[in-house]
């Protein structure tokens, strides 16, 4: 792959990563791992206003993380690529390693 193509790929990957870079968006993805949900249920579950949730959902749809369909008056969202959950499992692994390192550091400092 040429350097130009690699750079384009990295830019697109950064766009997806930016769409994940908010705690409410991560909470939404975590909730949607249980299946499709309407905006009203997502907002209630994460404890945020529907307008705020809709804005975050829009960012994630534009990044290709979520898809939606209308069911009557409701808009139903679901994970477009459930493999994103593997990414969060990896992040949890990184956090566990950090915690181990911090625990070792605390023991050294005691």
Where are these regions (language model features)?
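Beta-hairpin "wing" of winged helix-turn-helix
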Residues: 61-71, 78
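N-terminal helix-turn-helix DNA-binding core of bacterial DNA-binding proteins
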Residues: 11-51, 74-84
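Amphipathic alpha-helical dimerization/coiled-coil segments
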Residues: 1-8, 12, 84-110
């Amino acid at each position: 792959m040429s350097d130009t193509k690699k750079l384009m790929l990295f830019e697109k990957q950064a766009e997806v990563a930016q769409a994940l870079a908010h705690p409410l968006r991560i909470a939404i993805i975590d909730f949607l791992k249980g299946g499709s949900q309407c905006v009203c249920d997502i907002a209630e579950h994460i404890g945020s206003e529907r307008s705020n949730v809709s804005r975050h959902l829009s960012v994630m749809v534009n990044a290709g993380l979520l898809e939606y369909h209308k069911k009557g008056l409701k808009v139903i969202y679901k994970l477009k690529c459930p493999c994103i959950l593997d990414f969060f499992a990896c992040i949890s692994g990184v956090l566990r390693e950090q915690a181990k390192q911090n625990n070792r550091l605390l023991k050294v400092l005691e």
